[in-house]
């Protein structure tokens, strides 16, 4: 049954992956920054100096800038149609009258988690491979930490967007809600007392790069929240009428 | 033995009381049609049977289980919306079902797809409504189920394909049980062993078609007469005639005795019965 879910996800998974690989390639190819980017930055001498360091460049430009912005978007693209499209297109009837709801739910959620996590693991490890190919001087021991932060953050967003997908009978609402969450999360970070709600610094692996290692409290908090969201999603799906 | 048993089923959509305490029994090996106009509550009743909708009140038992989820592998359902995954081709749809459905016969599905002359490798998204219906039926009929539930299975099909589908459904009876909804009377007359007529959330008749034709009668009067409500199903006012619809020999005799020599008894066909039950009292002059 998970194979059927994988087939449904295959095109968007491939497109996301290709976009991300293209992004990674572009940041390698564009190094050092073209003149117009340097002009845009003004005179951030320290930043430009840091960017000359392979380790800083790779972390800041990939984990801290590109990948971190894509993590919620990848989760949204994977999760939003998982349930809502079945309801909108009427295919949910085929599934629910041939398989118990628990099996339908588990196969959809597990496939989503698997695809999301697999992609994020690959996209977190790929830069290490690129750096090795280009003989850049990077600290490879930090990559497991970056990967863990990225995957846990992505899992949280995926669980949240899965819930949106379950709550919606069309595909537009989960996309709109997802975009609101993505933007809202970054805005919340601007308010000091609510800074902890901003998941982006965690997903960027800031603590790992700074040498403080994995932020275990945040990691477990996100995992617990993800489980709770999936449990809420299950009860909603179990009792939903179609 | 009854494959489906429903007792006192109620279903509300907000304030709308869609199904009003219905009872239903479907015998094993029979083709049982639920006949009713649009909005009568047929689809809602079926969805409650299959666990897609949760009834507010009432008991439901399907294939001996009060939890439809436990017997899903023995049920094949064709919903009103015959939508399948549009990115698949019929051949890929068969493979999809093979992985997903427990008692599925892929060779039978392919055989049916060929019989319907559907393009095997074209995307379902490019199919017409009729073609999608035929594909859905091919997939549903390839299930080795004990109970087949069809919700308006021939809607949108041309007359030739419709007859083929009706023959296929007819062939299922005996070993398999078929529960079938329709608002197309000739179809029901052609294939159903038993019929339940549903109007405004209630069943107004359960029984065999022949029994219905035998028991429902028109009593025609030249002028309007006063009849007790417990004796008549409906009355129809027409120019120069007042018609009462009665059910059963007892009621027929009682009405005749009330106006001796003034009542003329006429036979009713299924369409007459259906129309009088659906419309209830009517004034055709208005």
Where do the model's predicted regions map?
Chain A
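Hydrophobic/aromatic residues in alpha-helical transmembrane segments
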Residues: 75-79, 126, 159-160, 199, ...
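Transmembrane helix boundary and interhelical loop/hinge segments in multi-pass membrane proteins
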Residues: 77-96, 109
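Residue-level signal for transmembrane alpha-helical positions in Major Facilitator Superfamily
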Residues: 75, 122, 156, 228-229
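Transmembrane helix-loop junction
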Residues: 4, 85, 128, 132, ...
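Aromatic- and glycine-rich beta-strand/loop motifs that create alpha-glucan
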Residues: 1-20
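Long, hydrophobic alpha-helical segments
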Residues: 59-85
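Terminal transmembrane helical anchor/hairpin motif
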Residues: 8, 27-61, 175-242
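Secretory targeting signals
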Residues: 20-21, 25-28, 48-69, 105-166, ...
């Amino acid at each position: 049954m998970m194979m059927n879910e994988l087939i449904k996800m295959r095109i968007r998974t491939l497109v996301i992956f290709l976009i991300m690989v293209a992004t990674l390639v572009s940041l390698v190819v564009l190094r050092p920054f073209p003149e117009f980017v340097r002009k845009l930055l003004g005179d951030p001498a320290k930043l430009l100096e840091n960017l000359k360091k392979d380790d800083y460049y790779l972390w800041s430009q990939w984990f801290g800038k590109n990948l971190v912005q894509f993590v919620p978007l990848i989760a949204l693209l994977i999760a939003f149609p998982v349930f809502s499209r079945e309801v909108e297109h009427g295919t949910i009837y085929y599934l629910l009258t041939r398989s118990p709801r628990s099996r339908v739910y588990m196969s959809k959620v597990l496939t989503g988690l698997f695809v999301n996590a697999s992609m994020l693991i690959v996209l977190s490890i790929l830069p290490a491979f690129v750096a090795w190919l280009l003989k850049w001087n990077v600290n490879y021991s930090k990559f497991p930490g970056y990967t863990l932060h990225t995957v846990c953050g992505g899992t949280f967003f995926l669980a949240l967007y899965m819930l949106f997908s379950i709550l919606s009978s069309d595909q537009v609402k989960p996309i709109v809600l997802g975009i609101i969450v993505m933007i809202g999360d970054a805005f919340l970070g601007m308010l000091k007392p609510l800074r902890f709600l901003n998941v982006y610094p965690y997903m960027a692996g800031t603590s790992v790069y700074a040498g403080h290692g994995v932020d275990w409290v945040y990691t477990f908090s996100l995992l617990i929240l993800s489980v709770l969201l999936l449990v809420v999603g299950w009860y909603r799906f179990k009792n939903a009428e179609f | 033995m009854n494959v489906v048993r429903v007792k006192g089923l109620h279903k509300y959509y907000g304030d709308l009381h869609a199904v009003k305490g219905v009872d239903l029994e479907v015998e094993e090996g029979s083709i049982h049609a639920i006949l009713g106009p649009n909005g009568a509550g047929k689809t809602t009743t079926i969805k409650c049977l299959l666990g897609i909708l949760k009834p507010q009140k009432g008991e439901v038992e399907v294939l001996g289980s009060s939890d439809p989820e436990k017997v899903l592998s023995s049920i094949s359902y064709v919903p009103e919306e015959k939508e399948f995954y549009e990115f698949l081709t019929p051949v890929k749809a068969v493979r999809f079902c093979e992985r997903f459905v427990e008692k599925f016969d892929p060779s039978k599905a392919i055989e049916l797809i060929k019989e319907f002359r559907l393009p095997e490798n074209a995307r379902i998204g490019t199919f017409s409504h009729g073609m999608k219906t035929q594909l859905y039926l091919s997939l549903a009929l390839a299930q080795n189920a004990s109970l087949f539930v069809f919700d308006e299975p021939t809607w949108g099909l041309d007359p030739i394909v419709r007859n083929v589908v009706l023959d296929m459904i007819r062939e299922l009876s005996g070993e398999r049980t078929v529960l079938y909804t329709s608002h197309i009377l000739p179809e029901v007359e052609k294939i159903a062993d038993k019929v339940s007529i549903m109007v405004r959330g209630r069943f107004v008749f359960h029984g065999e078609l022949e029994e219905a034709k035998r028991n429902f009668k028109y009593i025609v009067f030249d002028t309007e007469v006063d009849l007790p409500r417990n004796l008549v199903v409906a009355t129809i006012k027409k120019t120069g005639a007042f018609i009462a619809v009665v059910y059963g020999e007892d009621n027929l005799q009682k009405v005749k005795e009330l106006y001796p020599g003034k009542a003329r008894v006429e036979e009713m066909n299924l369409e007459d019965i259906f129309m009088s039950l659906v419309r209830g009292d009517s004034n055709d002059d208005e």
